[in-house]
From Swiss-Prot:
Glycosylation sites: 56, 167, 275
Keyword Zinc: no
Stated name of the protein: Lactosylceramide 1,3-N-acetyl-beta-D-glucosaminyltransferase A
Superkingdom of origin: Eukaryota
Cytoplasmic side: 1-12
Family: Belongs to the glycosyltransferase 31 family.
GO cellular component: Golgi membrane
Bilayer topology: Single-pass type II membrane protein
Taxonomic source organism: Xenopus laevis (African clawed frog)
Species lineage: Eukaryota, Metazoa, Chordata, Craniata, Vertebrata
EC category: transferase
Keywords: Glycoprotein, Glycosyltransferase, Golgi apparatus, Membrane, Signal-anchor, Transferase, Transmembrane, Transmembrane helix
InterPro entries found in the cross-reference section: Glyco_trans_31
EC number assigned by the record: 2.4.1.206
MF annotations from Gene Ontology: glycosyltransferase activity; lactosylceramide 1,3-N-acetyl-beta-D-glucosaminyltransferase activity
Amino acid sequence: MLISARRLRRCQFLQLLASCFVLSLMALLVQEDNSLISHVKSYSYRYLINSYDFVNVSLSIPRDRLDGAASYRYLLNNRHICLNEDVLLLLFVKTAPENRRRRDAIRNTWGNEDFIRSQYDANIKVVFALGAEGDPVKSREIQQDLVNENKRFKDLIQQDFSDTFHNLTLKLLLQFGWVNSFCPSAKFIMSADDDIFVHTPNLVSYLKSLPIETQDFWIGRVHRGSPPIRRKTSKYYVPYEMYPWSSYPDYTAGAAYVVSRDVAAKVYEASQTLNTSLYIDDVFMGICANKMGLVPQYHVFFSGEGKSPYHPCIYNKMMTSHGHLDDLDYLWRQAIDPNVKSISSGFWGNLYCRFVNIMLLCRISYVDTYPCSAAWS
């Protein structure tokens, strides 16, 4: 009887433990904003159905009702930037009016057009896309500073919508609308945040290696089957009323991506018939692209939200790295150092960098920079 009682208590304990586990799991599953459930739903839709025609139809509106970028006035415009020039890459940097230091850092490093032209024989144009200061107390002074800045550098493109997170889609329309109107001959167009490091020499070399008439080209950090975030405290919260479906079409992270000029034209065309109230610009871009039958291509050296490891073996292949504010000058000097190429050259150099990249990128604790597969590329 003693043994039976012990066994009984043990069984009761295990049952209690199992019940607690099941109840805890149920409590998680019934939460509306549960991330696991959202991802299961979105991936199920992405891989079982994978059709977003109804999204395109639902978000389409007549042209006469579109509140697009065409209704916003240019406060600053440099329409002659591309005039009579053969431009390999037109690079838009999404910036805020008050971020002068970031713009200057970019001009002095990876956005230095003269350096790229002289050292890499490529004509790139770097322009800064922004809206207007929303604070009426600061707006006059900041706008005058922008006017003075533009007189000196002639690289600001500004419209009179309020420069806020919820107007990022308007900034996207500003970029593709400006390309369509003032620089349609640029072979490639890039959009990047102002806290991004772009390894322009690597990017230019890559773009120059592509066929002359490359079409349907769209590369970056691809998000596939991503669900809308329903958590109201999130910066990226999207209510059901705005987007009721369980999955977004495939899109590239808005931090940095590159498209060919035909893709820019197609996205702009699609944007003219879609509701622009969805304020997450990279998702809106994905919807526009999906409507035109465009598919993004994953490039392993376009970073996610994380910052690239500092190492010459990484610099040799990196395209972008996210989250750089005070270290652009240091990273730029390191990245273009002639010794970087020599470190990875030859059999032993390649083997050494392969080992280093595996150690840096193939971690159990994943950091959102480059995937482990980048170590083998």
